[in-house]
């Protein structure tokens, strides 16, 4: 008997789940795994939550967290938010994995984010500002949205390289980039993170590295790539990073 395991099921919408169920053989078992406290799917429906609340299938809830220590401020803050409470935003008394940085307006927030990514986090924790630190935004638009922060961080962290501009986006050698569509021919998929190795204007090609594998894009194919110094929280679901900076503004 076959078993199909679907992870990150909170991202699955109604149409995709219907297609999956139609394709599943009658004698196959289906195990769905996910977190109902994550953002819902971009498409319609709340499949995972509805399946759990239906009472029609056995449900096992995992409550122990192994990714962080039990006393992690990330974990304690997440639990308080889930319970509808404000997390502890005060400065930590000792070494911590969660910090709150105050900013009174979007312009100040952007300046603080840039300082954190470029200087403070690399100096304090020894992390690479491009490969190890990810800015995650609630939205693309706005002064502290992913689009503008990508432009700001790209200019500061990776200026004056060979570049190509397509669709209002600039791609430079050394950039962090994200694939935003599934490409089965290139074997790169929506949400994959890579790094630009080379931009060749003569050949009209960009070469990027995804987990040690070289992928070539013609300049006409760059609409499937975006700079990824900053990304939306939706696009980052299922990923993990050594350090994350999240702007939380009233405009969000």
Give, region by region, the residue ranges found by the protein language model:
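Residues immediately flanking
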Residues: 8, 36, 140, 199, ...
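Conserved helicase motor core of P-loop NTPases
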Residues: 33-177, 181-186
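Conserved protein kinase catalytic core
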Residues: 13-14, 41, 145, 204
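Structural motif
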Residues: 3-7, 31, 136, 178, ...
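SF2 helicase catalytic motif II
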Residues: 1-17, 28-38
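Short, conserved "post-DEAD/DEAH" coupling segment immediately C-terminal to helicase motif II
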Residues: 14-28, 46-51
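Conserved acidic residues
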Residues: 2, 59, 242
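Conserved nucleotide-binding/hydrolysis modules and their immediate coupling elements
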Residues: 13, 150-252
């Amino acid at each position: 008997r076959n078993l199909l395991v679907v992870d990150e099921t909170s991202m699955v919408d109604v149409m995709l789940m219907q297609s999956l169920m139609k394709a599943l053989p009658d004698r196959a078992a289906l195990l769905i795994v996910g977190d109902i406290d994550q953002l819902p799917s971009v498409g319609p429906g709340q499949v995972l939550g509805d399946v759990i609340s239906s009472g029609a299938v056995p449900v096992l809830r995992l409550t122990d967290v192994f990714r962080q220590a039990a006393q992690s401020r990330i974990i304690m803050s997440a639990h308080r938010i889930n319970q509808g409470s404000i997390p502890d935003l005060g400065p930590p008394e000792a070494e911590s994995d969660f910090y709150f940085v105050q900013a009174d307006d979007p312009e100040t927030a952007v300046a603080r984010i840039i300082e954190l990514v470029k200087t403070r986090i690399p100096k304090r924790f020894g992390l690479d500002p491009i490969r190890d630190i990810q800015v995650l935004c609630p939205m693309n638009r706005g002064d502290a949205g992913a689009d503008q922060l990508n432009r700001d961080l790209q200019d500061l962290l990776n200026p004056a390289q060979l570049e190509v501009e397509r669709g209002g986006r600039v791609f430079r050698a050394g950039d962090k980039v994200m694939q935003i569509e599934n490409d089965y021919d290139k074997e790169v998929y929506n949400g994959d993170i890579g790094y630009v190795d080379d931009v060749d204007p003569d050949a009209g090609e960009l070469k990027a590295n995804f987990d040690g594998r070289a992928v070539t894009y013609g300049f006409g194919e760059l609409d499937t790539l975006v700079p990824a110094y900053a990304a939306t929280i939706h696009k980052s679901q299922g990923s993990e990073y050594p350090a994350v900076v999240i702007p939380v503004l009233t405009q969000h």
